[in-house]
Amino acid sequence: MTKKVDFYFDFASPNAYLSHKVMQSIKERTGAEINYIPVLLGGIFKLTNNKPPMEQFFGVKNKNEYQNIEMQRFIQRHGLDKFQMNPHFPVISLQIIRGAVAADMDGYLEEYLSLIHISEPTRPLYI
C-alpha cells in the first residue's frame, strides 16, 4: 500500500520551501505519494489566533537566532546550499497561491510548483 503524505504549504514560508526541496528524496526513499495542498499561512495564523514566528518571538531572547541556526543545519544536512532568503521577506503570496489552486484544479500543480519559487535564487520573484 502506497503511503500518502499531505504537504500543506505557502510559497511565502521559507520552511515550506526547504521542506519542498527534500520531498522528492522522501518520495524516492519511501515510495510515498506527496499531495501538495496550497494554503495561506497568514489566514491560518489569523484563524488560530497565532502570529508569524517573526512577530510571535520578537523580543524573546535568542529565539530567532536559534531558529536561524536550525535552518542552517537543515540546509547543510540536505545540501541546499543555494538557498537564499528572499530579500523582500515577508512576502504576500495570495496571487501565486491562487495560481497554485487553479493549477491544481487543472491537473498541473507539479509543473506550476517547479516554476514558482519565491526563495529560488535563480528565479527571483518580487511581490
What do the PLM-derived regions correspond to, one by one?
Residues 14-15, 23, 80, 123:
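A generic structural signal for solvent-exposed, polar alpha-helical segments
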Residues 2-19:
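Local sequence-structure signature of Cys/Sec-based thiol-disulfide redox active-site neighborhoods
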Residues 11, 90-94, 123:
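Aromatic- and histidine-enriched alpha-helix N-cap/loop-to-helix transition segments
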Residues 21-116:
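Structural alpha/beta surface segment adjacent to cysteine/selenocysteine redox centers
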Residues 117-127:
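Single conserved hydrophobic/aromatic residue that forms the stacking wall/gate
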Residues 17, 46, 127:
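Short glycine-/acidic-enriched loop or helix-start segments at secondary-structure transitions
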